């Protein structure tokens, strides 16, 4: 089912970690309805997810999945595995296929036995386990181009963060329904880390400084 609602979210696997990133713009037709929309959620100690599509449907899924993860931990004493979490959501979405949740989901998690895990789900419950990267939303075609060009399975977490940010930045420059900042999370064996705005700004400043340095070096070579 093709649902490309306004937003851009990306997920990728690198160096035994999962990186999730989203923009912050919520649109209502051609209106920018919210410039600080939350599209990245922590579900469990080792699982986070991104949302794209209908806000009400997406938030209902977040509440449901968070509650199910807590119940699983109460019953078993363990955190719900990422595959079990994604499969549960797939079954929930499929059971509502007559009146579907109009949303696209990316689930990223870390399994202490199997390592980094990444899944994408469509509104009818179709689930794919992604071995490299994925993207959703109206800006996803642009984000995919950047991810295809720059992805390396062996890249470090730092390199993966920069690639995810570059994919989002490119989408925000060309897609009118994406923009207004970036949300970022890294999931490792240590758990889910959701970055503060100040931390993201610091990363962006570092990327700008590095890019400016490269441009200056090229200019000097040409002048010679």
Curated annotation (Swiss-Prot):
> Catalytic residues?
7 (nucleophile)
Q: Which UniProt keywords apply?
A: Autocatalytic cleavage, Cytoplasm, Hydrolase, Protease, Proteasome, Threonine protease, Zymogen
The protein's GO terms of the molecular function aspect are: threonine-type endopeptidase activity
User: Catalyses which reaction?
Assistant: Cleavage of peptide bonds with very broad specificity
Q: What class of enzyme is it?
A: hydrolase
Its biological purpose: Component of the proteasome core, a large protease complex with broad specificity involved in protein degradation.
Family stated for the protein in its record: Belongs to the peptidase T1B family.
Q: Could you identify this protein by its name?
A: Proteasome subunit beta
Q: Which organism is it from?
A: Methanocaldococcus sp. (strain FS406-22)
């Amino acid at each position: 089912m093709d649902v490309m609602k306004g937003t851009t979210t990306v997920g990728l696997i690198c160096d035994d970690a999962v990186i999730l990133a989203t923009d912050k713009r919520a649109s209502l037709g051609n209106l920018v309805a919210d410039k600080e929309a939350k599209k990245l959620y922590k579900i469990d100690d080792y699982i986070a997810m991104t949302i794209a599509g209908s806000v009400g449907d997406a938030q209902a899924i977040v509440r449901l999945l968070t509650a199910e993860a807590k119940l699983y931990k109460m019953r078993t004493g363990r955190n719900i595995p990422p595959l079990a979490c994604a499969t549960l959501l797939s079954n929930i979405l499929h059971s509502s296929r007559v009146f579907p949740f109009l949303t696209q989901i990316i689930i990223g998690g870390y399994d202490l036995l199997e390592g980094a895990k990444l899944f994408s789900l469509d509104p009818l419950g179709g689930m794919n386990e992604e071995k490299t990267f994925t993207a959703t939303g109206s800006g996803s075609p642009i984000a995919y181009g950047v991810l295809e060009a720059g992805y390396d399975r062996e890249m470090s977490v730092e390199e993966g963060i920069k690639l995810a940010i570059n994919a989002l930045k490119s989408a925000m420059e060309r897609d009118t329904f994406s923009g207004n900042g970036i949300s970022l999370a890294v999931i490792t064996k240590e758990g889910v880390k959701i970055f503060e705005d100040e931390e993201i700004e610091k990363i962006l400043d570092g990327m700008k400084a590095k890019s400016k340095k490269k441009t200056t070096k090229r200019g000097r070579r040409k002048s010679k």
